[in-house]
Amino acid sequence: MSFEHHTGDLESPFRRKLLLGTAALSAASLLPPQAFVQQALAQQFPTAKVSTTGLAVTDSEVTVGILHSVTGTMAISETGSVEAEKLAIEQINAQGGVLGRKIKFIQEDGASDWPTFAEKAKKLLVNDKVASVMGCWTSASRKAVLPVFEQYNGMLYYPTFYEGLEQSKNVIYTGQEATQQIIAGLDWVQKTKAAKTFYLLGSDYIWPRTSNKIARKHIENVLKLKVLGEEYFPLGSTQFNSVINKMKLSKPDVIYAIIVGGSNVAFYKQLKAAGVDLNKQTLMTISVTEDEIDGIGGENIVGAYACMKYFQSLDNPNNKAFVSAFHKMWGDKTVIGDVTQAAYLGPWLWKLTVEKAGSFDIDKVAAASPGVEFKGAPEGYVRIHENHHLWSKTRVGRARTDGQYDLVYETANLMEPDPFPKGYQ
């Protein structure tokens, strides 16, 4: 059973049935309507039935974990994820929670350090016994925690677009994998810009290196085009003048940039200072969302293209309500990027899956995940595939001076996720 996201929807058939079935409880009928529904749900789903493996579930609460970097070089990217997850939890609680239980969260800081992520994941699963974790950003952090989630049988909702080549019973990947972003984006830029030469850049860790490996294979083997250069920089790097000079000399049709976190601020400022006009030099990024532009400054990246599945400027009712709620909770000046939106999907998809499973038990939630759909997604609509990735649209945006993106392209239909594309292993 899946549920649409309607705030305060007390009149759904499911809830009407509950209300009718518990109308005889005269004491409960004195409660406010939302509390009445919550109590009725909790009684229909007793703790002993919905939590059989010792998770942090009581008759009135269920505890989840939030695990992101709020310090270090990745804080610029991950803070939005934390804010989105807290907003989703607040909205879910306002609707009565999950199976009649309010969501409580325990937040840990991965501190932009992969061993710290693994240590905190173990704490959340073993000590706190959380029913799920919303967390990680970089692939390095996800790779660090994955053995922990598999060993202790936890459930991670991972929000970042990533390189693919992974699938786990213990992870729901709410961002895009390579075929939905890297390959689709390269096809668009080649076709639209008649591009023949590319220069690949990235931060020096697993996601950019693997993504550029996939990009190079696609450029050379499928599109039959040329890569003029490929360079990597340690996380937190601020010196890009040398590679900028090389690119100015080699004149690639497309700069393909997968630099992450705070390094983006230095890179785009130095690019502009070197006289590179992104309205004339095509640059495509798959790592700069509105969150990063907030630090970069719109004037330093205007004209660049980004291939994502979500932009804050998307014009649909779900997104307007989401942006409004986000600004109300976190301030009008906050911006919302692709990963922030994908992080917002995590608590909602978990809630819907728990309700479909009728249980918080990890194995039952994992088994119930395929086919769960969230019609209230700000990006429009998403559905969980059998491979635990999401069906979603691919979009291309162009950076504006105000730090937002203009939507310039989107796929007509949802793209099926394929984390293991043939020929790209």
Name each region found by the language model:
Residues E11, P33-G65:
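C-terminal segment of N-terminal export signals and the immediately downstream linker at the start
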Residues F45-A48, E373-Q425:
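Solvent-exposed, acidic/polar segments of extracytosolic/periplasmic ligand-binding ectodomains
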Residues K49-V50, F117, T174-F198, R209-T210, ...:
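Hydrophobic alpha-helical segments within soluble ligand-binding/sensing domains
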Residues V50, I76-E83, Q95-L165, F233-F240, ...:
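Beta-alpha junction/loop-to-helix N-cap segments that form part of ligand/metal-binding clefts
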Residues V70, V171-L235, V254, G331, ...:
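An alpha-beta-alpha
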Residues N212-C307:
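Extracellular/periplasmic bilobed ligand-binding domains
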Residues L271-Y344, E355-F360, V408-Q425:
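Extracellular/periplasmic periplasmic-binding protein-like sensory domains
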